[in-house]
């Protein structure tokens, strides 16, 4: 497999350098991300490891989603319903953390966490180890993005809250719906 060379940096590198991004930058990135993930989902692919390290940003602001290494086809149920936990613990949805299968809404959760990180420069859940973070993903409410930055509109916080709902049924049905909000 060959991938095009992309001049730029990862979103993680950008966040480390700058901390939080401006609201307009974060929204632009999220609009591109939801478009890209919509294309993946429309092709019956769940990424399962969305995080800033897997999103490259070119100098012109265009993003590229990378590392589909643990992605899985939606019709490949034996791969999405194993007892192995896939993905990075800081972005893993509660259902995956508890060993259940991945769905489109698993990627929605990760995008909500990513949006939070873009706007605050930090992760919503921290811990001393992966298990502690996974337990917080499963049980703790996501901290208010507006408490960290009161200039963020309530409508944007509502997008994050809906995307990161603990129950997948309460999240956006797909990336297209998240993009529309």
Residue ranges and their predicted role:
Residues 90-181:
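C-terminal lobe helix-coil module of Hanks-type protein kinase domains
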Residues 33-45:
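Protein kinase catalytic-loop region centered on the HRD/HxD motif
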């Amino acid at each position: 497999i060959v991938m095009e060379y992309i001049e730029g940096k990862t979103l993680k590198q950008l966040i480390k350098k700058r901390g939080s991004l401006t609201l307009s930058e974060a929204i632009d990135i999220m609009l591109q991300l939801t478009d890209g993930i919509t294309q993946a989902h429309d092709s019956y692919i769940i990424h399962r490891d969305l995080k800033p390290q897997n999103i490259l940003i070119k100098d012109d602001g265009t993003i590229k989603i990378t590392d589909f290494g643990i992605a899985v086809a939606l019709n490949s149920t034996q791969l999405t319903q194993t007892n192995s936990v896939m993905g990075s613990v800081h972005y893993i949805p509660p259902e995956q953390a508890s060993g259940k299968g991945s769905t489109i809404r698993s990627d929605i959760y990760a995008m909500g966490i990513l949006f939070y990180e873009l706007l605050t420069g930090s992760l919503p859940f921290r811990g001393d180890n992966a298990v502690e973070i996974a337990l917080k993903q499963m049980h703790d409410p996501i901290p208010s993005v507006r408490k960290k930055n009161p200039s963020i509109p309530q409508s944007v916080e509502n997008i994050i809250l809906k995307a990161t709902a603990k129950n997948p049924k309460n999240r956006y049905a797909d990336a297209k719906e998240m993009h529309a909000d």
